[in-house]
Each structure stands twice: as structure tokens, then as C-alpha cells.
Regions:
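Non-heme Fe(II)-dependent double-stranded beta-helix
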Residues: 1-19, 24-132, 138
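Catalytic core of non-heme Fe(II) oxygenases with the double-stranded beta-helix
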Residues: 91, 116-191, 228-237
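A structural signal for short, well-ordered beta-strand segments
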Residues: 106-108, 149-151, 219-223
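Conserved double-stranded beta-helix
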Residues: 170-204, 208-281
Length: 281
């Protein structure tokens, strides 16, 4: 799919009823990619000890230092706000997750040469579905609770460890296990710097090992419906000056259009806060 021809309906069809993922070519400029990569390299060069996910085997093998995360990207450069607010992606997310969808996280993942892959998994808020009894009875993917956007800053190839996924597994809504033959069935999300890979996080996937001599880095954006608790506390992390100057779209992404939870007892004036008729919100 080309950036200039993106239709929200096409993205939603691919995520819900298609393979679960779609590549949009040429979404971001070379200058945006270069600036994002510069910041990611700067903040990850000497910081191997950051929290990461789905790297239990790498931790056991003492190889976590070959995979590095950079969190709180909104506070590290305007280019990351530009990526999060990209109009074609925002339009698709409004249709997929609802008009008031939010951003749950924006981070970078850098896998160094010979860096490890991940265990096959599904993404937040489904990511601990290996404990299914912690979820409501009857939960299913007839409506989505997550969308992921991966923006490569380096080439995503089989050699560099492009994300692997098993098409159509978003309908399973379960954590992949050893008997699922993930690596025998998987395809790759190959892409070029500046592309955007949009996928439903319930689709089985994982980063693959980097067998090349170059880094493989990407910006990872998580979008959620307005009522799902975000993974990163972005509102607190970015600071008051950022919030004050935020665009209407960014305020929405930070969850400021949806005021809950709040201390309802502290509201001293009699108010009809919710409802179809004459509500304050």
C-alpha cells in the first residue's frame, strides 16, 4: 500500500479480516527518519540497561545488552510527535479504535548485530494472555483493543531480523505456544526506512535475531481505545510545557479527551457529567 493511496477502510480490512498487518510505503521522509535515528542512537549508545519485553531467553543467555529500548520519545524530539500524529495513520486508527483513541506507548527498539529475537507473543493489553483466567469470560477480537505501528529506521530484512508474524492469527486470541509451529509458519514484515507497518497486536509476532553487521532500529507506537489503561504514563512523562503546546490530536493521544479516572467526590458543583442530553463532557 502506498502512502498517497491509503484508505482507512483498507487498513481496517487488513487488520480485522485480512492477514492482521499491512505495510504502507513511504510514509515518512528521509529527513524525519534520519532525525529519529540520530536521537535513538544517542539515547541508546550507553544505555543497555533499560526495561524490555519478551526477552526471557536473552536474559538467561546474558545477551540483553544487544537489544536496547528508548522510552518517552515524545520528550526527546518533535519528529516523534510528527510520527504519532501522521494523518493517514490517525485516520485509520479513528476508524479501527474509535474517534477518541489514545496512544499507549511510543518507544524505540534497537537490535545490535548478533542481537537476539523475541519469544512469539501478542501485544498489550493482550500480552499476558498466557494467563487467560485474568481476562473476562468471552473476550474475543470481534472488536480490537490494540493497534501497533512499526516505523523502520533501518532496513527490515530477513537478515537484519524483520518482525515475523503468522497471518490471520489475530482471530485466535491466545498466546502462541510451542506446539503452534510459529517459526515454520511465519512470514516477515519486511520494509524500508520511512515505511509504516500497521498491525493488530493480537496477531502472533516477534522480532527475529539480527544476523547482519548493522543495527536494526525502529520506532514502535501503540494505539488503544480510549478506555484501555495506557502502558506508558505519557501524560506525566512529557511535562506541563509539552501538554500546554500540544495540538488537539496530541491532546487526544495523551488521553486528555477522556477524563477518567478522577476524584468525583472532589467536584463541588452539582454537575451532569455524562449522558446523551446536556452533559458537561
Amino acid at each position: 500500500m502506498e502512502a498517497g493511496a491509503v484508505a482507512p477502510e483498507g487498513v481496517v480490512e487488513a487488520l480485522l479480516r485480512g492477514p492482521g498487518a499491512v505495510r504502507i510505503r513511504g510514509v515518512f521522509s528521509a529527513a524525519q527518519v534520519a532525525e529519529a535515528r540520530r536521537v535513538v542512537m544517542e539515547h541508546s549508545q550507553d544505555r543497555a540497561q533499560t526495561v524490555t519485553h519478551f526477552q526471557g531467553q536473552a536474559a538467561e543467555d546474558q545477551r540483553l545488552h544487544l537489544q536496547r529500548r528508548v522510552w518517552n520519545l515524545l520528550a526527546k524530539g518533535d519528529v516523534f510527535s510528527e510520527m504519532a500524529e501522521q494523518p493517514a495513520i490517525v485516520a485509520a486508527m479513528r476508524l479501527f479504535l474509535g474517534d477518541d483513541f489514545i496512544m499507549g506507548s511510543i518507544a524505540a527498539n534497537r537490535i545490535l548485530p548478533d542481537g537476539p529475537g523475541q519469544e512469539p507473543h501478542i501485544d498489550y493489553p493482550y500480552w499476558d494472555f498466557h494467563a487467560p483466567t485474568t481476562f473476562p469470560v468471552g473476550i474475543n477480537t470481534s472488536f480490537p483493543l490494540n493497534a501497533q505501528v512499526t516505523i523502520p529506521l533501518d532496513p527490515f530484512t530477513a537478515q537484519t531480523g524483520a518482525t515475523a508474524f503468522v497471518p490471520h492469527t489475530q482471530h485466535e486470541l491466545r498466546y502462541p505456544g510451542e506446539g503452534d509451529a510459529f517459526f515454520e509458519r511465519c512470514e516477515r514484515m519486511e520494509a524500508e526506512p520511512g515505511d509504516a507497518i500497521v498491525f493488530f497486536g493480537a496477531t502472533w509476532h516477534c522480532a527475529m535475531p539480527n544476523h547482519s553487521a548493522q543495527d536494526r532500529s525502529a520506532v514502535l507506537i501503540q494505539y488503544l481505545p480510549k478506555f484501555v489503561k495506557p502502558m506508558e504514563d505519557l501524560r506525566s512523562m512529557v511535562g506541563e510545557a509539552f501538554v500546554k503546546n500540544a495540538s488537539p490530536t496530541m491532546r487526544q493521544l495523551l488521553g486528555l479527551n477522556f477524563p477518567y479516572p478522577q476524584n468525583l467526590e472532589a467536584i463541588a458543583v452539582a454537575t451532569n457529567a455524562e449522558g446523551r442530553k446536556n452533559a458537561m463532557r
